[in-house]
Amino acid sequence: MSWLTPELIEILITVGKAVVILLVVVTCGAFMSMGERRLLGLFQGRYGPNRVGWGGSLQLVADMIKMFFKEDWVPNFTDKVIFTLAPMIAFTSMLIAFAIVPITPTWGVADLNIGILFFLMMAGLAVYAVLFAGWASNNKYSLLGAVRASAQTVSYEVFIGLSLMGVVAQAGSFNMRDIVDSQEHLWNVIPQFFGFITFAIAGVAVCHRHPFDQPEAEQELADGYHIEYSGMKFGLFFVGEYIGIVTVSALMVTLFFGGWHGPFLPPFVWFALKTGFFMMMFILIRASLPRPRYDQVMAFGWKVCLPITLLNLLATAAVILYNA
């Protein structure tokens, strides 16, 4: 066929890879909700979901059926357009951010020269989902959760970018593949240990995960900005949170733990094992740490994490200048 040119074939292959990768990310996010409940049960000395299917294996299917058939109610007192837009942003922002992550030397969605900046942009966009949900719900608890989210995001996105500048300076590029290639002999977690620690803390905060789940604190805000949502709109928020965990875990692997590099096993297996480990760490943190007060969260970001990040950046610059 004359219209099937090599350029078109390459475009179709690229689109096919992108669809497969993003579908796998969404599936991992959905299955992580099931895995989290089982692991929390293990950590707390109980069984977790074990009634639907063999050993609870079909619990995710039951949850999906329940979500699909729940009434998707939109209260009359809400701003309906923004109320509907918020869960869409929550679901898509971190999913699109995963597009810059190279899974293997040949598998990835987008190879951008501004990869890290693109992630920071999408992480900043994710907070608009919370702000829109809190404002459009016309509920005081939702609004309080949204205000908390905006303040927390401003605090922690200041140093989530600075924590990555040491990695960028060492690799000499914002491109994710270049950063992975620069770790072929030494992972960045060793020279950039403090950068990794602050990025991991900020990553948990970006995902609004415990102990940084102040915007949706159940005991204080009755589930915060989620309070007026039901049905699939609530489901989009729910799955979007787990997609954020998958994305941040993959970025930790890519930026600090060598990406797909590793001995003996294929690159994809190494990437999956490393990412799965950090996804489990998110669950372990939820099971083991208490939720601090809101003022303690803010003070920790500005008084502890930001100075550490700046000192790490200065030390990295000094080492690079000395070696030059």
From Swiss-Prot:
<protein>
    <recommendedName>
        <fullName>NADH-quinone oxidoreductase subunit H</fullName>
        <ecNumber>7.1.1.-</ecNumber>
    </recommendedName>
</protein>
<comment type="similarity">
    <text>Belongs to the complex I subunit 1 family.</text>
</comment>
<feature type="transmembrane region" description="Helical">
    <location>
        <begin position="186"/>
        <end position="206"/>
    </location>
</feature>
<feature type="transmembrane region" description="Helical">
    <location>
        <begin position="81"/>
        <end position="101"/>
    </location>
</feature>
<dbReference type="GO" id="GO:0005886">
    <property type="term" value="C:plasma membrane"/>
</dbReference>
<comment type="subunit">
    <text>NDH-1 is composed of 13 different subunits. Subunits NuoA, H, J, K, L, M, N constitute the membrane sector of the complex.</text>
</comment>
<keyword id="KW-0472">Membrane</keyword>
<dbReference type="GO" id="GO:0048038">
    <property type="term" value="F:quinone binding"/>
</dbReference>
<keyword id="KW-0520">NAD</keyword>
<feature type="transmembrane region" description="Helical">
    <location>
        <begin position="154"/>
        <end position="174"/>
    </location>
</feature>
<dbReference type="InterPro" id="IPR018086">
    <property type="entry name" value="NADH_UbQ_OxRdtase_su1_CS"/>
</dbReference>
<keyword id="KW-0874">Quinone</keyword>
<dbReference type="InterPro" id="IPR001694">
    <property type="entry name" value="NADH_UbQ_OxRdtase_su1/FPO"/>
</dbReference>
<feature type="transmembrane region" description="Helical">
    <location>
        <begin position="304"/>
        <end position="324"/>
    </location>
</feature>
<keyword id="KW-1278">Translocase</keyword>
<keyword id="KW-0997">Cell inner membrane</keyword>
<feature type="transmembrane region" description="Helical">
    <location>
        <begin position="265"/>
        <end position="285"/>
    </location>
</feature>
<dbReference type="GO" id="GO:0009060">
    <property type="term" value="P:aerobic respiration"/>
</dbReference>
<feature type="transmembrane region" description="Helical">
    <location>
        <begin position="11"/>
        <end position="31"/>
    </location>
</feature>
<keyword id="KW-1003">Cell membrane</keyword>
<keyword id="KW-1133">Transmembrane helix</keyword>
<feature type="transmembrane region" description="Helical">
    <location>
        <begin position="114"/>
        <end position="134"/>
    </location>
</feature>
<keyword id="KW-0812">Transmembrane</keyword>
<dbReference type="GO" id="GO:0003954">
    <property type="term" value="F:NADH dehydrogenase activity"/>
</dbReference>
<dbReference type="GO" id="GO:0016655">
    <property type="term" value="F:oxidoreductase activity, acting on NAD(P)H, quinone or similar compound as acceptor"/>
</dbReference>
<dbReference type="Pfam" id="PF00146">
    <property type="entry name" value="NADHdh"/>
</dbReference>
<comment type="function">
    <text>NDH-1 shuttles electrons from NADH, via FMN and iron-sulfur (Fe-S) centers, to quinones in the respiratory chain. The immediate electron acceptor for the enzyme in this species is believed to be ubiquinone. Couples the redox reaction to proton translocation (for every two electrons transferred, four hydrogen ions are translocated across the cytoplasmic membrane), and thus conserves the redox energy in a proton gradient. This subunit may bind ubiquinone.</text>
</comment>
<feature type="transmembrane region" description="Helical">
    <location>
        <begin position="237"/>
        <end position="257"/>
    </location>
</feature>
<keyword id="KW-0830">Ubiquinone</keyword>
